[in-house]
């Protein structure tokens, strides 16, 4: 019962049907967060914001771009980035210059144009990494920095898990319990798809309760199927081309400095999970190129910025299937769903409480990976400098809940708490004497 599951690096040995199910599991893990970004942006733009269909197809194609750039080696899914929400909100509220008489829908392409430039900044960093060498770059990112950052990635998501779960604790607990049961006691295929089983079984329970007239504790309905009924079966995603303006560029592009730090943390987490050093091979410059191209492509056609997803790192840890082919299947599913508004809305109808129950496990797993990263690399916490670096990262990553917002050229720029933690951690590690870690090339 307590034996560690053997890692699977080639899912083809499981057979096609099982691979398809594993891809479905990754898709469910990313779906809620991916479609939440356009939902939130729509509130900023009074219903004239991002399209869920465009978001899904851009996430799918962006993920495939990323895999091509990384030699098909890194099992990462790229979904919608939350880091740019503050930028979208700022652009929506611009009312000077060319934005003075614009409708909300007319402002959106300019926000996307700023994200295209942000994607280009990733390519600049990739060039720097390639020119100076990853070893020199990684001198600033030892385990005493990346480990606590990974811990913060998971813990910073924890409030989201609790907020979703508390809408109906019964369903959340069922989803969580099913995942634990299948992960610990499951046999064969069921042992490597615990999240998918948690989603399916809790969804069935929720639907039965819904049909029996049971409501959430706050009186709201467990399901809302109006959007499903109104959606068509097949429709093309409503693409729109981005536009450029220096004001919106100054709002959106600097956010890339924050998301680049998060990217390094995510790639470190995936490396720690799979036991493969992806910062070394295929290289940090390649992962940055993949993320940058995916972000620029998505925004060019009216989608949100893409980013490597921590949720899918949690899936990797639970299933112990590390084959990137499975993640590419999830990308294909996302692309297919983008052409069917009705199916997308059906999956989107998944109760928030179930998402919360699943997230309890996934987000905790991410933080546990960070702890493991520190332990396996034998970080010496008897040294005061290591304690200080880790302490500042943890407090900053969890303490600056909404980040820090400051004004540049009359526009607001927000550094997320994770970006602040990464910047402070990297700076302290560089300044304080007594470094005891060498990156292995």
PLM feature segments, named:
Residues 88-93, 183, 312-327, 333-337:
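Interfacial segments of multi-pass membrane proteins
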Residues 17-32, 171-175, 193-194, 235-266, ...:
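Hydrophobic, membrane-embedded alpha-helices of multi-pass small-molecule transporters
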Residues 2-4, 34-38, 42, 175-182, ...:
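Juxtamembrane interface elements at the cytosolic ends of transmembrane helices
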């Amino acid at each position: 019962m307590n034996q560690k599951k053997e890692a699977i690096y080639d899912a083809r040995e499981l057979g096609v049907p099982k691979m398809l199910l594993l891809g479905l599991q990754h898709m469910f893990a990313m779906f809620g967060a991916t479609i939440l970004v356009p939902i939130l942006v729509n509130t900023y733009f009074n219903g004239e914001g991002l399209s869920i269909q465009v978001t899904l197809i851009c996430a799918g194609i962006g993920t495939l771009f990323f895999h091509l750039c990384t030699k098909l080696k890194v099992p990462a899914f790229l979904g919608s980035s939350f880091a740019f929400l503050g930028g979208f909100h700022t652009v929506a509220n611009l009312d000077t210059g060319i934005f003075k008489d614009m409708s909300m829908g007319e402002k959106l392409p300019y926000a996307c144009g700023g994200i295209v430039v942000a994607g280009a900044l990733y390519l600049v960093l990739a060039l720097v990494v390639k020119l100076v060498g990853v070893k020199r770059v990684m001198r600033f990112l030892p385990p005493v920095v990346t480990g606590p950052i990974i811990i913060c990635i998971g813990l910073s998501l924890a409030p989201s898990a609790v907020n979703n779960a508390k809408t109906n604790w019964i369903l959340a607990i069922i989803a969580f319990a099913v995942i634990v049961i299948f992960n610990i006691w499951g046999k064969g295929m069921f042992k490597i798809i615990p999240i998918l089983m948690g989603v399916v079984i809790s969804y069935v329970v929720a639907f039965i309760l819904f049909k029996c007239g049971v409501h959430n504790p706050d009186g709201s309905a467990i399901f809302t199927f109006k959007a499903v009924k109104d959606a068509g079966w097949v429709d093309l995603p409503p693409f729109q081309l981005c536009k450029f303006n220096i004001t919106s560029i100054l709002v959106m592009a600097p956010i890339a400095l924050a998301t680049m730090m998060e990217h390094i943390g995510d790639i470190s987490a995936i490396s720690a999970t799979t036991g493969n050093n992806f910062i070394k091979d295929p290289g940090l410059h390649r992962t940055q190129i993949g993320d940058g191209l995916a972000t620029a492509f998505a925004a060019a056609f009216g989608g949100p910025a893409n980013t490597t997803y921590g949720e899918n790192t949690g899936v990797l840890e639970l299933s112990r299937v590390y084959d990137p082919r499975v993640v590419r299947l999830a990308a294909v599913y996302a692309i297919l769903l983008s052409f069917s508004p009705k199916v997308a809305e059906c999956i989107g109808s998944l109760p928030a409480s179930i998402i919360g129950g699943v997230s309890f496990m996934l987000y905790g797993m991410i933080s546990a990976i960070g702890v493991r990263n520190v332990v396996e690399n034998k970080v010496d916490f008897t040294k005061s400098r290591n304690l200080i670096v880790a302490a500042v990262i943890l407090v900053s990553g969890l303490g600056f809940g909404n980040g820090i917002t400051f004004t540049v050229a009359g526009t607001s720029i927000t550094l997320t708490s994770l970006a602040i933690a990464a910047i402070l951690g990297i700076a302290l590690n560089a300044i304080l004497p007594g470094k005891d870690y060498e990156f292995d090339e």
